[in-house]
Amino acid sequence: IEHSPGTTRTAALAFLADVVCILIFVTIGRRSHAEGITVAGVAQTAWPFLAGLTAAWLIYRAWRRPVAVRPTGVTVWLGTVAIGMGVRAGIGAGTAPSFVAVASIVTAVLLLGWRAVAARVARRG
């Protein structure tokens, strides 16, 4: 793997974009359930998914092709949801099937969506 300032920067920005996506997902969810949009509340809801995201990045070595929809985006998305839900189950937080479905759909749109847009822009550029 070639490491250069450009590839390191791209990976860092991609990881940051993924973090922002998780925070957007959590904020939308908290708002739709009339829960407070506080730093503490968002952090409490987000941390299992952020842990899943980080683990998925490490397990799948997402920094190698951080902007690719496949396989990176798909594996990061699936890992984020699976690990995040596993952590939530482990701490006694909700993992109702409807929540798993909504979380899966919304995070897919966000985590795969920004990558698809980036790929399209890169092809045009």
Positions of predicted regions on the chain:
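Alpha-helical membrane-inserting segments
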Residues: 21-32, 55-63, 83-87, 91, ...
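Membrane-interface helix caps and helix-loop-helix hairpins in membrane proteins
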Residues: 35-39, 66-67, 92-97
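Internal alpha-helical transmembrane segments of multi-pass membrane proteins
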Residues: 60-79, 97-104
